[in-house]
Amino acid sequence: SSLAFVSNPDIPNIPTQLGATHAGNPGANSAAGTMQHLAFKVKDHTELMAMRDRLRSKGVPVLGPLDHGMCVSMYFAGLENLSLELSYSAEPINNELWIDPEVVELAGISAEELAGYKNPNTFSDSHGSIGQPAINNSTGPHMTNYPPGVYEKSMQIPDEIALNMVESKPPVSP
């Protein structure tokens, strides 16, 4: 898989507020809908240490490794106040040991919901045949901050047309 950090010329003009727009560290808060921190999985302790050395060799301070019991992690800052984590687990996380009943109660999660989280329904790949849900009746999260009507129109574009709507050639030719 890939991860892209996208920027545009207007982003530097948007104020950053630690504790609201960004956490700034892996233990601090940020507003709902923002990214508190992003964790990347590495294979094992050897790979974790290799990544730590690689980061430190580039002048990036790294906290850890820290053994959390369910995983071993290390934390560092990314560009633009992103808080990043690298971690591995030697064994699958035992949800009977690591799901705190007090937190479940405080979050208002019912026994039925919890069972669904612990054992989600299996998903059968439909090989791209599932259509777009009706935007006005969809229960899933929605993208926002579009001019009025643009999101609704965009979500009505057939997939086969959307596939070729954007520039797909690299900026440099061989």
Report each predicted region and the residues it spans.
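Short acidic/glycine-enriched loop/turn segments that link adjacent beta-strands
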Residues: 68-72
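Short beta-strand-to-loop elements that line the ligand-binding cleft
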Residues: 63-67
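Glyoxalase I/VOC metalloenzyme domain signal
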Residues: 1-61, 77-174
